[in-house]
Every structure is written in structure tokens, then in C-alpha cells.
């Protein structure tokens, strides 16, 4: 049975009594964001709004984006990536569980040196696919051309963010490539792998909020 969104107490400065708000709103106030489902337009718009809203409040405070996603809509993922590059605070990305397809694309888009994966996380990269298989020949050809353009764009971003040659990324993304956290670090999708004993671990950001 679904338990719904948990609620936690929150007290504004100067207030005596706490109010109960859902846990995501509480964490959003601490700039802790979550990509924990398939990427779609609605989720992308929500995350972009949350990233933009505090943009002028305190530029010195990083944002933390926790990623556990099987991927999803290509343009929605690209829009999240682009927003991360243009907000003033650094966006740290943390992979918990799985970052696949557009999930790994967003993960790689975090601030260089601030992209982290938990020790048992998995990362998967591949080329974008098309779900359009029926229709007139002309429409299929136009879509195929668009898919190739998108693939070229995504391949270039992966190459830029990982430091790998473009031809290597192009060959690797011909198929689904699953990696461990350590392998993702070697490939360049992330930077450090989180250490369980570290007092500054990604999860400690949650417990200190």
C-alpha cells in the first residue's frame, strides 16, 4: 500500500511552533534536489524551477542533485543539463542506485570535481533511441535525421564532460554500457566515489539538513 509522501516538522526562524511539510519541500529549502524517477517534461520543469528560484539568493551555496533514474525523455534530460550549466551556484550530482541513459547524462552534467557516486551505484550510457516506427516514409526519414543530430549533441557532451575522445564515446554508446561506480570514475562520468567513513559524504548532507 502506498504510504504517500512523508511529512517532517519545520520551524521558520522566529516561530515558536513547527509546521508539518512534505520531506521534499523540507530538503528543497536546503538545496537538496532529487531525480528519483523516469525523466519527463513535468519533472524537468519542476527541477529547473527549483534550481532557478534560489539562483540570486546565495550564490556561495552549492545545490545537490541526487540521481536514481532509469532515464527517460531526451529533451527533458537535456533541458535539466542546460539549466545546471547556467545557474550560478555549482550543482553537485550524486548517483544513488542507478543513473542510466538520460540519468547518466544529468549525472555527468554536475560541476566538474563535484560529481559523486555511492560505492554500489551503477551507471549506464547509450545513444538516444526513437520510439517512432510507423508512419509515412518521409516522416520516418526526417525523424531519423533528427535522432542523428541529437545523438551527435549528446556524444559531444559526454566527450566534453568525461575527457574521452569523441570517437571513443561514439563507439561506446552504440550499445548499453553499464559500469560500476569505480568504472564510471575511470571513464570520467563522475569524479570521486563516496567513502563510507567520510564525515563529508553525500548522505551526510541529508542528515545535516
Curated annotation (Swiss-Prot):
Organism: Huperzia lucidula
Protein's recorded name: ATP-dependent Clp protease proteolytic subunit
Catalytic activity: Hydrolysis of proteins to small peptides in the presence of ATP and magnesium. alpha-casein is the usual test substrate. In the absence of ATP, only oligopeptides shorter than five residues are hydrolyzed (such as succinyl-Leu-Tyr-|-NHMec, and Leu-Tyr-Leu-|-Tyr-Trp, in which cleavage of the -Tyr-|-Leu- and -Tyr-|-Trp bonds also occurs)
Gene Ontology MF terms in the entry: ATP-dependent peptidase activity; ATPase binding; serine-type endopeptidase activity
Pfam families per the UniProt record, alphabetical: CLP_protease
Keyword list, A-Z: Chloroplast, Hydrolase, Plastid, Protease, Serine protease
Superkingdom field: Eukaryota
HAMAP family named in the record: ClpP
Enzyme class: hydrolase
Location of the protein in the cell: Plastid, Chloroplast stroma
PROSITE patterns cross-referenced by the UniProt entry: CLP_PROTEASE_HIS, CLP_PROTEASE_SER
GO CC, any one term: chloroplast stroma
Reported function: Cleaves peptides in various proteins in a process that requires ATP hydrolysis. Has a chymotrypsin-like activity. Plays a major role in the degradation of misfolded proteins.
GO annotation, biological process: protein quality control for misfolded or incompletely synthesized proteins
Quaternary state and interactors: Component of the chloroplastic Clp protease core complex.
SUPFAM superfamilies in alphabetical order: ClpP/crotonase
EC number: 3.4.21.92
Family designation: Belongs to the peptidase S14 family.
Active site annotation, chain numbering: 101, 126
